[in-house]
Amino acid sequence: MTELSPKYNPAEVEAGRYQKWLDADVFKPSGDQKAKPYSIVIPPPNVTGKLHLGHAWDTTLQDIIIRQKRMQGFDTLWLPGMDHAGIATQAKVEERLREQGISRYDLGRDKFLDKVWEWKDEYATTIKEQWGKMGLSVDYSRERFTLDEGLSKAVRKVFVDLYKKGWIYRGEFIINWDPAARTALSDIEVIHKDVEGAFYHMNYMLEDGSRALQVATTRPETMFGDVAVAVNPEDPRYKDLIGKNVILPIVNKLIPIVGDEHADPEFGTGVVKITPAHDPNDFEVGQRHNLPQVNVMNDDGTMNELAGDFAGMDRFEARQATVAKLEELGALVNIEKRVHSVGHSERSGAVVEPRLSTQWFVKMDELAKQAMDNQETDNRVDFYPPRFNDTFLQWMENVHDWVISRQLWWGHQIPAWYNAEGEIYVGEEAPEGDGWTQDEDVLDTWFSSALWPFSTMGWPDTDVEDFKRYFPTSTLVTGYDIIFFWVSRMIFQSLEFTGRQPFQNVLIHGLIRDEEGRKMSKSLGNGIDPMDVIEKYGADSLRWFLSNGSAPGQDVRFSYEKMDASWNFINKIWNISRYILMNNEGLTLEEAESNVAKVAASEAGNVTDQWILHNLNETIAKVTENFDKFEFGVAGHILYNFIWEEFANWYVELTKEVLYSDNEAEKVITRSVLLYTLDKIVRLLHPIMPFVTEEIYAQYAQGSIVTVDYPVVRPAFENEAAHKGVERLKDLIRAVRNARAEVNVAPSKPITILVKTADSELEDFFTSNVNYIKRFTNPEKLEISSAIAAPELAMTSIITGAEIYLPLADLLNVEEELARLDKELAKWQKELDMVGKKLGNERFVANAKPEVIQKEKDKQADYQAKYDATQERIAEMKKIKS
């Protein structure tokens, strides 16, 4: 047995420990075929850069689950991996190249992809280093990457199979276009923001010049693609105009007036311009009326040759130029400023352009129905908290076909080939013969990520051991922000291709926010690097904070004050452990367990030993129950209370009555209970704090704590009588301590304590444990009886089953106390005067921030409460004096 260092130093505790775990292969599945499998696939982080605090939270929760299940005897697999993150990673690499004055087009596809692979290797190494510092118990022998050949094979098979079923198709439709990244986006990759904009009202003159029709748009630059104006066929103002033409301003070409219910007579003038290549609703109108589709924009957001004099302009520059020209021609009626919702690319931040484009799509109706129906079966996915099941179903009910092609180079190239005759070949391998060219587009990143739970297990080979044993996986841990992006897609793809749910449970957590509740972001500059936190506090402190503040579905606020509290708690555990082990006298864990069994059988020990074992039992039961419900925050509070309050503050202190005695036999029992309880605490904490618990465990046991048994409830430890008795004992001691504090009497001053109880069992219990009462209350005189009469002037405390009297004459000198209270009253009056003066200052109230004013008001209320309480104490003292 070695000795813990005098001071807890997380850097020393954690240094080299992770590599020792890896060298010992303790993170791999046990391979025990009799053990029940439990598997988790890590949500693969993007290889775009370093991991943030949200990743640290997400992976900490997974590690807690897998470490506990490993200790409980499950055959555990936690499979790690990373995502190629097509658009995000490509954007990062292009940004790096731009700094060197190079574009991807300068390099060409192959050389550019070489650069991206270099980036991937660089950041994959960084991510794995971060995982190590976090202590994640993943099995690196099964590490996967979404562009691995095995996963690529699965992607190709899924694409081909869905294509053959008619559920993947290629067509020209309005899609969300990112002009910065020059690629299509799915609906959920578009973030809508309220921005200041305008409705531009303009007149389109009838061909005969008899009148003008007024239309309005937020995007006047698209008018060069107008092919009609629409009115409602039932609108009496315009129904006679259907079939006639208007003159498109600037362009001076004739476009027809069509009757279509898309035009709402109640909205605006009831006339809408129709631009089928640049608006999804207009596209539908165009389809119904067989209108041409005129695309007036290049893929980089500049205007093309169909915009005439405005060709080559950026779309926003063209907007202003178009408006100026309309005004010059007298066609601009007015500009109506307003705030409206505008779609932005989730990745590049660019304003998204609705644009006609030929893309590949997944037909979603059957896949969505299958996923929704499955939630009514035993094969369903259970969401924690359950409300997210409704979120999932609501999205599936309203889902649109999924655009899966991306105009990128980094990703899974679409397995479709074209020849000069216009034929399309879709297959897992390239077609035989010459003259075929593969589609240059790649698949949406989420297409491959949707296959992650089963492609990582070897699918489409369903005979491999990992797929048969560990799929479906047990639990997925992820944030609520990607339920639509990822969770939903994994569910419907897994059901379609394996017939099983991808995971049995989904634990949904929230977002990490700053101390003020704001989302962490680069723009706010409030992001926190988890590695900086680990360097200062250690990984265990960060993990404790992340788990202890965690409730399913809820956000968590980060603060350094909370990190200080986390470190302090671990330091407390360290100091308790050091105290116990220094007083252990060579006792082994096996000997301690044998002696504890005697305590449970009432063959040795005392009531406080029985009490702590009973409470340990309850703690194990409650922590295990809350872990099973993924209520890690609740479990953390239970552990904290047991360790700090019941074990450290009470039991460890109570044991000094024995350890400082001459009774060697009792000392052995007490040391045994201390070591046994410490061991169970360390095991309970290990899933959350792996480093410090391994260090403590190594002081009294052989091997690694990673694979030892998790604590279980022992019925023999249940002892309600001991629990009840010691709780009353604690109540008595607390009551005396509180009374001393209330009248400012030092703990060192002996006092008279009278305990009156009509409960004979409680009287016997207090009497037989009088040494504990004396040790904690320092009485000059202690009397316990049912016949005690209440003194006339005494501090009285009532606890369950007893009344406690502390005669005031023994407690204080009334004259000295009155003098002290007068000084205290003057202090509170001074504080009240100062804060009252500040709040009475009109300039201060007018100029100070609301939160500053509220802070002063809170101080005023606090000082007033203290002033009033002091006045009450003075009145009590004067009553005693008289």
Curated annotation (Swiss-Prot):
One of its GO terms (cellular component) is cytosol. Residues 808-882 form a coiled coil. The gene is valS. This is Valine--tRNA ligase. NCBIfam families: PRK05729.1, valS. It comes from the Bacteria. A motif ('KMSKS' region) lies at residues 519-523. HAMAP family: Val_tRNA_synth_type1. ATP binds at K522. A motif ('HIGH' region) lies at residues 45-55. GO terms for biological process: valyl-tRNA aminoacylation. The keyword Transmembrane does not apply. It comes from Streptococcus pyogenes serotype M28 (strain MGAS6180).
